[in-house]
Structure formats: C-alpha cells, structure tokens
C-alpha cells in the first residue's frame, strides 16, 4: 500500500498481481512518461475492479463508482481511502494538463457495464458496440497521445480505430467468460449466423479497424512508433 502522498513513480513500482494486468509502462515508453502511464492505468484498473470484481450488488458498484468520480473531480490531492490511486493521478493531471473528461468517460463505461449486466441488456448492432468503445477504449488512446503531445484530428481518429479494434477483439475472445456473467458483447442483429461464421466476420471488421489506425505509428515519436 502506498502512502497518502504517493508519487507517480511509486505507482509504477507496484508489483503487478492482477490477472488481467499487462506491462503498461514498458520499455517502449520513454522514461519520463512511464510514471504518468502507470498512474492512468492504476486509475482504470481500480475502477474496473469496482465494476467487475467481487460480489457487490449493482447498486453498491454504482455507488462506489460515484465516489470514485468525486475523487477524480476533486481539485486537491486525495486524502481518502483511494489516496494511493488519486494522489499520483492528480499530480499527473496537473503536470500534463491531462483532460479529466477522458478519465470520466472511462467511469461512464464502467457504469454502463454494471447497468447492462444487472439488466441483462444486449447491444442491438455493431454501431452500438462501437459507441460503447468510445467510452471504454478510445479515451485510453487519446490520453496516451496527449502525453506524447500528439493532438491532431487525424491522429486521434486513427487512435480511436485501434482502440476500438482492441476492445472488440477483447470482447470476442472472452465470450466464454462474459456470457455466463450476464455480459453480451455480440451485435444482436447478426446472431442469426452460426457462431464461428459470426466471430470470423466480426474479427474481420476489427482487423479492418486496426489497419485504418495502423499509420498512427508514423506519428508517435520514439520506440512507441516506427
């Protein structure tokens, strides 16, 4: 556990123990950005755990996410139970003028997930899934581009395409886990197809999105690009 005055570099140094973790602050990232990326990831990971882990009711999860949002929107460093997350995050927000609205979009996605799971809701078509990706995935790419100082409209569109593709791929590789938990990430207007053919078609669409975003690597400096 970090102290209440934890610094971004201390978040970066935390051991990775969550089963869905991945090396977010890898050698591909310049050293001066790694603590910021780690702080953003710690925020997203903690919010995801509120929405997805444990045995809380939907009402309890939504209440916890609301409290999490209050911490995010606070103008001073956190001194509450989530100080290990928000103290370094607030420093990063100030240092890089990070758009808080993008972080809030992630919370909106988690709230949408909680409500959809509780209601057994489905997504009527691929457009609805892509709208969800605008909240759940695309903000992450835009936050990273902001750290790199890449803000032009074309770069943001390419980033959105890549992030949406990655989110869709994640949905479809986890169907066997999500469906028993009441989460349905298949477009309902296409489910009349046999499942293997449906997944093949959906993955082809995700590949198309990924290729639309691929030229972004030429706009990102350093090892993260080409």
Which residues fall in each region the model found?
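Acidic catalytic motifs of isoprenoid enzymes
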Residues: 1-221
């Amino acid at each position: 556990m970090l102290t209440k005055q934890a610094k971004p570099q201390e978040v970066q140094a935390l051991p990775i123990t969550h089963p869905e973790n991945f090396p977010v602050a890898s050698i591909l990232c310049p050293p001066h950005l790694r603590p910021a990326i780690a702080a953003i990831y710690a925020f997203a990971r903690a919010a995801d755990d509120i929405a997805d882990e444990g045995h809380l009711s939907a009402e309890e999860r939504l209440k916890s996410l609301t409290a999490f949002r209050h911490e995010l929107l606070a103008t001073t460093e956190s001194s509450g139970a989530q100080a290990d997350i928000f103290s370094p995050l607030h420093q990063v927000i100030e240092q890089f003028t990070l758009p808080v609205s993008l972080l809030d979009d992630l919370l909106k996605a988690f709230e949408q997930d909680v409500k959809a799971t509780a209601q057994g809701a489905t997504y009527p078509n691929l457009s609805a899934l892509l709208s969800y990706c605008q909240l759940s995935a695309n903000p992450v790419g835009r936050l990273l581009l902001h750290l790199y100082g890449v803000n032009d409209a074309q770069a943001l569109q390419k980033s959105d395409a890549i992030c949406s593709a990655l989110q869709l791929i994640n949905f479809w590789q986890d169907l066997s886990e999500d469906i028993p938990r009441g989460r349905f990430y298949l477009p309902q207007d296409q489910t009349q197809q046999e499942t293997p053919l449906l997944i093949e078609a959906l993955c082809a669409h995700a590949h198309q999105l990924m290729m639309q975003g691929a030229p972004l690597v030429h706009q990102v400096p350093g090892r993260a690009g080409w």
